[in-house]
C-alpha cells in the first residue's frame, strides 16, 4: 500500500517552503535550486568534476543526484550534469528538501515528502495562479 501524507503534513511542508523562500530572499521565478543551495551553504558538485571511475560510482548511487552530510556538518549535493537543466534544478531542489526536512535516512515516507517539497517549491500553485500561467512555456 502506498504511503499517503496527511493534509496537515502537506500544509507543514508548504509552510517550510515559504519560510525557506523568505529566509533566502527568493522572490522571483524561475526558482533556482543552485542559488538556494548556495545561500544555504550547501556545496553543489557536478558528476563531471570527477574522473570517469568516480563518476561511474556516483551514477551507480543515483542516476540524478544525491546529498550527504559530512561529519563536520557540511552538506554536499552531487548531481548528474549530463541531464537537462530542468531535471538538474529539480534534483537540486529535491535534495534541498531532504536537508530542510531533516531526513536522516531513505524511506518511502521521506521520498513522498521531498517529492511534494520539490514540486511545491519549483511551481507554487499560488504563484502559478497569480501569474496566470497555464502551460510550461509560460
Annotate each PLM feature.
Residues 1-138:
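Active-site hotspot residues in diverse enzymes, especially metal/ion-binding acidic/histidine motifs
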Amino acid at each position: 500500500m502506498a504511503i499517503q501524507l496527511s493534509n496537515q503534513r502537506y500544509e507543514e511542508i508548504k509552510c517550510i517552503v515559504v519560510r525557506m523562500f523568505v529566509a533566502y530572499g527568493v522572490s522571483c521565478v524561475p526558482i533556482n535550486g543552485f542559488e538556494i543551495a548556495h545561500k544555504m551553504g550547501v556545496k553543489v558538485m557536478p558528476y563531471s568534476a570527477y574522473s570517469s571511475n568516480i563518476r561511474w560510482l556516483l551514477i551507480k548511487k543515483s542516476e540524478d543526484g544525491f546529498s550527504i552530510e559530512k561529519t563536520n556538518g557540511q552538506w554536499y549535493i552531487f548531481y548528474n550534469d549530463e541531464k537537462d537543466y530542468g531535471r538538474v534544478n529539480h534534483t537540486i531542489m529535491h535534495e534541498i528538501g531532504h536537508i530542510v526536512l531533516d531526513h536522516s535516512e531513505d524511506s518511502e515516507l521521506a521520498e513522498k515528502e521531498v517529492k511534494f517539497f520539490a514540486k511545491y517549491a519549483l511551481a507554487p500553485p499560488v504563484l502559478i495562479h497569480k501569474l496566470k500561467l497555464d502551460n510550461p512555456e509560460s
